[in-house]
Amino acid sequence: MEPRINDLQVESRVHELLDFPVHTNQISSAIYECPNDHIENPKKKPYNCPHSGAKCDVTGDIQRLLLHLRNDHNVEMSDGRSFSHRYVHHDPKHLHHATWMLTLLDCCGRKFCLYFEAFHLRKTPMYMAFMQFMGDEEEAMSFSYSLQVGGNGRKLTWQGVPRSIRDSHKTVRDSQDGLIITRKLALFFSTDNNTTDKELKLKVSGRVWREQPVSI
């Protein structure tokens, strides 16, 4: 008579055959265990450096990236839910001479990246401002932000949801998910009333807030 093998013995044998054993239970998804006994949660994988000025291979958690951005990339940080920054482009006729700007924001107990840069959309010179959340997409969805550029009696406002830095800076920019201004229109917003294409000065202001959950 052949010996009977119960389910627990089968499961134990299967786990022994796996290079990366799996912890399972009845209410949660699988969590994979590495050979060094470290448990890997897919949602906690390292973040890539959000600095877009040059290719940077640094990865890590949010605290490590904050130190890296401030110490190695000299990125400044602002505190508070409201902010105002001035962007100056000395030669708006040539976007390849333009500089882009990254500022870190500390508000609502979380960190955000504020980008402003010049680029070409097909052949049209554009300026774009947008924000990204330093965390995962699920939590990013609980925040909203607004950006506004104004000057000379004109005002343009954008409101949106910050994308997670899990999405690359280029992905967000190419999807046009932010405040976009053509160069021609940007000159009308220039704070020194400059329409000679010699210099562009834009004041970009905004705020961040956490959305309240809707009660049913």
Swiss-Prot record:
**Inducing factors:** Induced by abscisic acid (ABA) and salt stress.
Alphabetically, which GO biological process terms does the record hold? Answer: positive regulation of response to water deprivation; protein ubiquitination; regulation of autophagosome assembly; ubiquitin-dependent protein catabolic process
Where in the chain are the SIAH-type zinc fingers? Answer: 5-74
| Pfam families linked to this entry | Sina_TRAF, Sina_ZnF
Q: Which domain of life is it from?
A: Eukaryota
- UniProt keyword annotations, A-Z: Cytoplasm, Metal-binding, Nucleus, Zinc, Zinc-finger
Gene Ontology molecular function: protein homodimerization activity; zinc ion binding
Major location category of this protein: cytoplasm
> Per the UniProt record, which residue ranges are transmembrane?
none
* Function summary: Probable inactive E3 ubiquitin-protein ligase that plays a role in regulation of autophagy. Upon starvation, involved in maintaining ATG6 homeostasis by competitively associating with ATG6, a component of the autophagosome complex. Acts as a positive regulator of drought stress response. Functions as a positive regulator of abscisic acid-mediated stomatal closure.
**Listed name of the protein:** Probable inactive E3 ubiquitin-protein ligase SINAT6
Q: Which organism is it from?
A: Arabidopsis thaliana (Mouse-ear cress)
State the organism's lineage. Eukaryota, Viridiplantae, Streptophyta, Embryophyta, Tracheophyta
Which gene carries the instructions for this protein? SINAT6
